[in-house]
Amino acid sequence: MMLLQRPKSYPDESLESFFIRVANKNGYNDVHWFLVAVKRYLLDIDPRKFQTFPTDICCINPYSSKKHSISRTHALHHLSQLTFNEPVDLLGIALNRNQMQFSPSTTALIRGAEVIPRSLLRKGAIPCCPCCLGEHGYASYRWHFSGYEYCHEHNVKLIERCSCGAIYDYRYAGLSGVCTECGENISASQENHEPKATRIASWLAGDDVKPLPDVPLSYRWGFMHWWSQISSSCKTRNNGEFLAFWEHWPNSFHKLIGKEIDFNFEYCVLSKNDLRVKDILGKILFSSIQLPDRNFRSNIILKEMFQYIETHLWDDNGKLANLRMNMLEICVLLNCSREQVTSMIEQGLLPPNRQLGKREILIVTEYAFYLGDVYCLWLSEFQSDEFNRSFYLSRW
């Protein structure tokens, strides 16, 4: 297979956009038929390895593979040679699966060095910025993720419909910006301009935007994911509240935690002695741990969560300290294994809240520990260079 035109990829370009540009430059108006030709070429090289190579542009990223993405990664290596691109450049704009997780249990995607929660990946049509298509001729990967609702460069809302009402998804309609239904150029609406949404988009693009935190990009996406979890909303759209939250940080977070605790204590169905961490703090605590990791330097949400717990642990006769935990929750909180927890019990470092039989083995789901004991264990044994008390008590 010979490609006469070999465009280079752009750093913020989506993989789908790059394939569309390569197809168009080499005489294919429809990227589907280009992918059919590419698959035929790959099958001639190795029929078994490339049998699952997709001809649907929406499935071209390695993460889309149902079982594993190795064959698609190999395919991208071959295509980088065809287009005279360095493999690292082409693989760098692809969305891959990643072993990291965003709390409480969201898988991660990785693009270059940027880790993004899969929960933010759009499932329907991908909106676009008509100005970007007209000026740059390619699509940004950020358009694929909710939270990025406005183009930070042109200050216009991303659109997914032409003024005629037809859906415009660049993956199928192309990068020309021309509606396939009415033949007119799509245009950005100047109405309902939201400066706050534009500021969030600029922040997600890497700009320093006050009052939003100056943290690495992966954490910015993580904080958007976290906000969608704790605000009980399917979409991270309340831009005013999100900005106000950071405007008054960290008091806004302490107030949010206190409100959650008071509400859960007031409406709990269990007796006070049987209350668990997940009943009172679970929603906020366990959604804050991996964003995408627990490094206090950048995961300032988790840092403030621990600050709040330490400050209020023994308030009201230890109502937080006496919350119950099970072994699985301890593993999450301390970032350790069940075997380590078992060893700490045997050494007397972590006392259960009841007397164990001589050869009794605790069930991992039994709420046999107190938060106060677990927190004190963290203080004495489990602090690390990036996950330690000095980050929020440096004045000492």
Predicted regions located by residue number:
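Basic, alpha-helical nucleic-acid-binding regions used in initiation and control of genome expression
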Residues: 1-396
